[in-house]
């Protein structure tokens, strides 16, 4: 029996570790895996979210700092081409939501988006854990990705350079 329990622990341990990790992929393909301990010391915030289901207070790391920990350009580094970036957030169930990268940066946007790990002073319910996105500025919960597992930055195509013929009258 002890061998069976040990065997199950060895099989399930990687799954538990995977469930407690967040993969961050930069636009150039560089990938960084963040774990709960990586996120534990990042600056945190509370966000009050009022949706049709009622008001709740979420708490967790500020997403801009999570992005920085994942090697993404935020703050003073977010200028020029990175302003064309958008972020695809994917939950463990495959649900996705999209944000503009600048929308997640407190230097560009007043609304704070967090990687919530608590709601109303308690850990998230299992269906939303280990993290979910929470934004006080959204009026609908459609971008509240539960069980956030992946953050991937993609670049919008650069606009074609206009030719002199495009401006002829």
What are these regions, as identified by a protein language model?
Residues 5-14:
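Bacterial N-terminal signal peptides
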Residues 18-169:
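N-terminal intrinsically disordered, low-complexity segments enriched in P/E/S/T
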């Amino acid at each position: 029996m002890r061998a069976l329990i040990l065997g199950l622990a060895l099989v399930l341990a990687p799954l538990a570790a995977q469930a407690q990790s967040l993969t961050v992929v930069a636009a150039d393909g560089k990938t960084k895996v963040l774990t709960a301990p990586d996120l534990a010391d990042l600056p945190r915030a509370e966000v009050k979210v009022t949706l049709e289901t009622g008001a709740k207070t979420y708490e967790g790391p500020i997403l801009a700092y999570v992005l920085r920990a994942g090697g993404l350009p935020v703050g003073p580094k977010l200028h020029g081409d990175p302003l064309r970036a958008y972020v695809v957030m994917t939950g463990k169930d495959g649900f996705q939501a999209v944000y503009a990268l600048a929308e997640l940066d407190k230097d560009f946007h007043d609304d704070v988006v967090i990687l919530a790990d608590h709601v109303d002073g308690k850990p998230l319910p299992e269906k939303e854990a280990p993290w979910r996105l929470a934004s006080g500025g959204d009026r609908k919960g459609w971008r509240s990705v539960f069980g956030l597992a992946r953050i991937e930055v993609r670049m919008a195509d650069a606009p074609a350079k206009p030719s002199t013929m495009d401006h002829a009258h």
